[in-house]
Structures are given as C-alpha cells and as structure tokens.
Amino acid sequence: AFGGQAAPQAYGRAIADGSVLALVAALGMAPSSHESDVAAVQLAAVALAMAGALGLLLPRAAPQQARGHLVLWLVGLLALTLSGAAWVAVGLPLILGATQRGGHPEWLGEHAKPNPKPAKRAVWLGLLVTLVPALALGIWHGPVLSATPVWATPVAWLQWLGWFLWPTWPLLLWTLWVWRRQWRTRPLLLAGLWLLWTLLPSLVAQGPRLLALTLPAAAMLAALALPTLRRGLSALIDWFAVAFFSGSAFVLWLYWAGMTFAYPQAAAKTVSRLVPGFNAELDWTLLLPAVAVTFAWLGAIVWRVRHYSMALWRGLALSAAGAVTSWVLLMTLWLPLLNHGLSYQQAAQRVASQWSEDRGCIDATDLEPSALAALRHDAGLQVRVGRDALACPAQLIAQSASNPEPAQTEGWRVLDRFAPINPRVMQWTLWQRSAR
C-alpha cells in the first residue's frame, strides 16, 4: 500500500537463505560427518527431492525450469531408493500429489494459477522411479530398520528428536502456530506432510540417524517463522547462539589441551578414563584450521554486535556459524580422539585376523552401516546383510555388554568375542558354522 516492500522473488530468496542457514545450524547434521554412513546420501537425496517438488508447484514455470525441477525430483527419489530408504521414497510422490490436489494456491498471488501438468507428471514418474528399482532389487527394508526399536521409551525418542532439530524446532513450532490459518497453502502443506512422513521411519530404526531425513522439511518450516519474529526475539536467539557455541568451543579447546599437554589435569584424567589407551600428539595440520575457524567465529560475533542487519536470516546467521565452528573443531582438534574412540577400524582388523576373505562371506545383518563400511574397507572382508547372507559360513552379531556370554546355538561355534569400541556398551561375537 505504501510502496517499498520487497519483490516476491527477493522475499522468496531471503526465506530460502534462511532455510539453508537453519539446515546448517541443525545439530543433527553433525553425527554423519565423521563416519562412513549412508545417512549423508539419504539426507542429500531428500533435500534434492524436496527442492524439485517445490519447483514443480510453481505457476507456469518456463519449460526449461520445469525440466530442471523434474530432474532434481527424480534424481533425489532414485538416490533415496538405492540408498536403502525405498519405504520413504515411495511415499513422497503421494505427498506431492496430495499437495497439488488439496493445497490452496493463494501463495502464488491473486491472479496466478498453478500449472498442474508438471506436478501430475512428476507424481507418476516418481512412483515409477521408486517402485521399479525397489521391487527389482528387493531393497524395501534397509539395514537401519529393526523389529525392536532402539528407543526404550517415547521420551527417549523425543529427546533425540529435540537434539537433532535444535535450534530449528522452536522456530518450527512457532511457524505452525503463526501460520495455522494458512496450513493448506502449498508450501506449508508440502513441508508439513513431508516432515510427518520422514519422521515415521525413525520410530522403528536401529539408531537415531534416520532422524536426519526430517531436517530439510524442518528447516523450511523454521525459515517461514523468520518474517514474524520480533527484533527482541531475534536478538535473544543470537545471544543464545553466542553463549552456547562459544561455550562449546571453549570446552573443545580445554579438553584438547588436556589430552595433548596433560593440562588441565582434570580434563586429561577424564579423557584417560573415557578413552583408555589414547595418546595425543600435536599435529599442526589439524591445529592451524582450528585456530583459523576460532578467529572466524570471534569475527562473526563482532560483526553481529557492530552491525544491525535487516535481512530475514539474521536470526540464524550466528547459529549456523557456531554449528560450523563446533564441527570444524571436532574434525580437527578432536579427530584423533574420535578415530580412536569411535572408529571400527581396529575391530574390523581383529575380525580379519580370525576370518580371512578366502573362507567366505560374513553375515553382518545386525551391524550398523558404519561398522559394515569398516569391515569392507579396512579389513577387505566379504560382508553381506539380509537374505543375501543366509548362506554365509560366518556370522557377526552385536550384543549388549550386559549379556557377557553368547547363547549357544546348534550348528555354530564361537570364534571370538570382544568389544568393538566401548566394552561397557557393546560386544561383538564372531560365529562359525560347524562342519556337518
């Protein structure tokens, strides 16, 4: 009415910038950064598919743009299917179809009419891309699903979910409240259904990694809250990010000094107790990037204090920068410790000492993806899971450390039993099929 308002494209790009920052800031991005895990591929695939789906709902997009969105959509679905999450991928075309038919197009403008043809075509092609490979290869159930979920209680699941989605979930809830009367507009409907669908597999997963599939939809919903935040609330988010990530960086540096120089002694004793046998050495190739990113973090704080930005994404800038800072410090200062305490390399080599590749394959259906990668890459073993592993002459089973003795099974004998990482958490038992 008064002029000076942002153009729709500029406004949309600012929201998109905020969603990227919300995704980067999410703590759930960190777990897959150190391990050889398929979760990173699945996260990228979900993000690609979502970007394509949103583009396909645009009104009267140019043919070249529509083809580009369709390619993103199909590549994302195919990658998600082949990475072992076909049960997730097959539902996404149905969500796109439901959004196209049931969503209101008010967000497109008064006189804009959606073009249903690209979205309808994408639904059928998406079902084809997901169903054909899944049925042909028999990959409906990936190795991350379990008949007995890892969550002891619903509260434990909610705690992991809150940790994975921090700091996006408070903004997500605010979006759902502020825009509750517009929930049938297509961006909100698509992101909401997408979030609910990607949440379901985590309820029956072997671990929390499948929660990462929720991050793209959660980041988009969180970004839609940014235009409604008051200046005081945005500043509160900033200062919380400064306090939280500065404290995190201080703790990381403190324990690095303890494990490297044995000072402070309390930190050194804690590391020795939690990771026995670890001896840290000063590595300049890891230290210099850590110093650089720490100064960059301090510079980001100074920039935010001295300059007031009118950009919509300002409330998430420090959260994203702090998350990147903590991740870089973990991957530099703490990398030797993580390799020693969390890597399956030594465990894989121990299995290889008991079972050589020429003796046949090993059934490792019970193991998580990072352990499978270590057995294949570090030990060079033939590892199989699921139905392909039924005929293997050896079996590697993961059991709780509270069960000290493996149950005897007719036709099998124990070759070795040891703790792959932490003896208080898990034990591996290597079984060999007895000769008949």
Language model: regions and residue ranges:
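Membrane-embedded architecture of ER/inner-membrane glycosylation machinery
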Residues: 39, 56-436
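Structured catalytic core of nucleotide-sugar glycosyltransferases
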Residues: 30, 42-55, 60, 174
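Transmembrane-helix signature of polytopic, membrane-embedded enzymes
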Residues: 1-25, 43
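Transmembrane alpha-helix boundary signature
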Residues: 2-4, 32, 59
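Short acidic/glycine- and proline-prone juxtamembrane loop motifs at membrane-interface regions
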Residues: 28-42, 85-88
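Alpha-helical transmembrane segments of multi-pass membrane proteins, especially transporters
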Residues: 19, 23, 43, 47, ...
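Membrane-water interface regions at transmembrane-helix termini and the short interhelical loops
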Residues: 26-32, 304-308
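Juxtamembrane loop-helix boundary motifs flanking transmembrane segments in multi-pass membrane proteins
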Residues: 17, 21-29, 146-153
